[in-house]
Amino acid sequence: MNRIKILPETIVGKISAGEVVERPASVVKELIENSIDAGANSISVYIKEFGIAEIKVIDDGEGIPSDDVILAFQRHATSKIKDEKDLQRISSLGFRGEALYSIANVSKLKIITQYKDEDTGTEVYLTGGNLVSQKPVVTKGTTVEIRDLFFNTPVRRKFLKSSYTEKAHIIETVQNYCLAYPEISFSLFIDREEVLNIPQVKTLYDRISQVFGLEFTEKLKFKTISKDNYKIELFLGGEELLRKSKGRQLIFVNRRPVKDFSIVNTIYKAFHINENHPQFFIFINLPPEDVDFNVHPAKKEVRFREPQIIHQLIFRMSEYQVKSSMIAEETNQWKVNADLSSISQISAFYTESIFNKEEIFHFFSIGDAIVVIQRVDGIVFLDFHAAHERVNFEKILNKMSEQIVKLTFPHVINLNPQDYVLIKENLHILNELGIEAEDFGENSIVIRALPEIIKYIDIAGMIENIALTLKEGTSTPDFIEIKRKIAATIACHSSLRANEKINHFEIKALLQELERTSDPEHCPHGRPVRKFISLDEIKKWFLR
């Protein structure tokens, strides 16, 4: 049996870094938070080779006193906490004294800083957490340069995603702090190209407009509510902004971007939706003692002292917005449609494969997406959206580019900076799938031609979802796999939606086309398309 040993400080440092520094975007996050805590009015971020080669953050904050610079790179060295009581009323973004220590342990780090009340500043250079040099300088604010990230932890590098995925995470990180701090100007440069240039503004509405565009922001409905020491500001998209993917769902607690699934679920309950996803921005402000950020190593999750108050307020706000837009939907998913003139009309016809050519069957719908088909030997439950997805997916992959329609008026799509970078670097894949797209500059692309099969769908929504697919990415970009994922996203957008009316002839054609696909049992995302229950099994339910 191996004996228990105390780990060396070098190993402890790398383990700690693994908890705080997951990817280049984690470094950007920690450095931006330090700049904000230093009272910066302007923050500039420079990236080379998606952050592996270099990350540089420059701010005009108050700087670090000369005597504290070396101490800042020691574990649990912080200016934010003096005793246990301070832990209960934290108002700064950083407080544990782990960020600089963790970053320095897995990189080659240089910091140049001068405290506002001192005549000279300090330049310090460290490699793998070890001090290499220190000298006096004259400067303003603070500049932190991170080079060769993960140079001494090669396994960590192997787990990074593709270059454009890592870039997207960096852009998302900077965007989040842009939204939370409209009074600070932000700029972001990736490989010398300006990606973001966001000047100071006075309101959250103006900042959302800067980041996501005025056209999108004008579609958001705003509501604010205060109770005791709680204040919640909600920007909620209506029905026209519902998306097939969870795009812009951002939550800020005391100006810190966080993940909170209970809050997200509260908004979904107000919408009464199962398939599409609302877009929203929530800004929650409450006393520091009523929220605990010390739950997650990267402070991504929070714990509220009185979560029920938060949820009640958000539900009331969301429900009011939804009702005022008159987009509340029917919630009973299992009510049989009384209108039998369309898909739910009892019909009879011939098809093939799982239905013998001589076999006559009947069908009707239950809920808004399931068709029940009667066979001699049992019944089949068919998700017609999933079935249509499978059919369209294979058309898109195999025949899409054969029927291209030139648009009379080219369609210009304005994207947020994160989506723009993702799409721009993968335009060649879109073109191979028959979507004739070009970079249009100013965070925009232009669509000049589309495959016949998708010419009537929401192109902007589809492009946003393709960007989300690309952001998920893989560690080793596989062209074929990326192409399949994009085709699956397009198929989802071009397929029949739940609640759409289709007649029995269309059902028949859909079943026949489904049988000709390579995998009629699953949609492109792997979900089941149909479920067969034999008559013998049904009889067993009744002990027959």
Swiss-Prot record:
Q: Which function does this protein serve?
A: This protein is involved in the repair of mismatches in DNA. It is required for dam-dependent methyl-directed DNA mismatch repair. May act as a 'molecular matchmaker', a protein that promotes the formation of a stable complex between two or more DNA-binding proteins in an ATP-dependent manner without itself being part of a final effector complex.
From what organism does this protein derive? Thermodesulfovibrio yellowstonii (strain ATCC 51303 / DSM 11347 / YP87)
UniProt keyword annotation of DNA damage present: yes
**The organism's place on the tree of life at top rank:** Bacteria
Instruction: Give the UniProt record's GO annotations in the biological process aspect.
Output: mismatch repair
Q: Read off the CDD domains from this record.
A: HATPase_MutL-MLH-PMS-like, MutL_Trans
Q: Which HAMAP family match?
A: DNA_mis_repair (MF_00149)
Q: Which PROSITE patterns match?
A: DNA_MISMATCH_REPAIR_1
What is an example of a GO molecular function annotated in this UniProt entry? ATP-dependent DNA damage sensor activity
State the protein's name: DNA mismatch repair protein MutL
Can you cite an annotated GO cellular component?
mismatch repair complex
Keywords, A to Z, come to: DNA damage, DNA repair
Say which family it is in.
Belongs to the DNA mismatch repair MutL/HexB family.
Xref: InterPro entries: DNA_mismatch_repair_CS, DNA_mismatch_repair_MutL, DNA_mismatch_S5_2-like, HATPase_C_sf, MutL/Mlh/PMS, MutL/Mlh/Pms-like, MutL_C, MutL_C_dimsub
